[in-house]
Amino acid sequence: MRIFFRTALFLSFIIFCSSELHSTHIRAGEIIAKRISSTSLTYEFTIIGYTDTGSEVEFGGGKFDFGDGNIIDVLDESALSAQKILLENQVALNLFKVIHTFQAPGRYVVSYFEQNRNAQIVNMENSVDTPFFIETEILIDPFFGLNNTPVLLIPPIDNGIVGIRY
């Protein structure tokens, strides 16, 4: 019996140590594209992520895809600035700015992908294992002038309650 408990304890320890830890934290996000100059194809991209402040995992460990074949890690040195602003209701706004120049006019789907979405989202099955993904589309056309994406003026954070009209 003693050998059984030791074996069970040993196996439990091995399983616990080999499992990958995922702390969930991402609630919402957006990508803002702002063309810097009318004479170049250079854009300033702002990636905004809204996170739970109770998590020790920082936002920004994902991949940012410019839609032209260039993909960067948001936490690497290509980010011009990184900022974290504490909001109310245990929510933080995480902001990263990146500059990118496109090679030619065209339509580009710009996206951001990261693991660790927050758990217990009622209208989404298995939200904790569903990666966080946001995208926006920009059209660079010399006849349209400067093309910027819309900017959300109110953070997309709701505190809904099941069964109660919001």
Predicted regions and their residues:
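Bacterial Sec-dependent N-terminal signal peptides
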Residues: 1-27
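Long, compositionally biased, intrinsically disordered segments
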Residues: 21-166
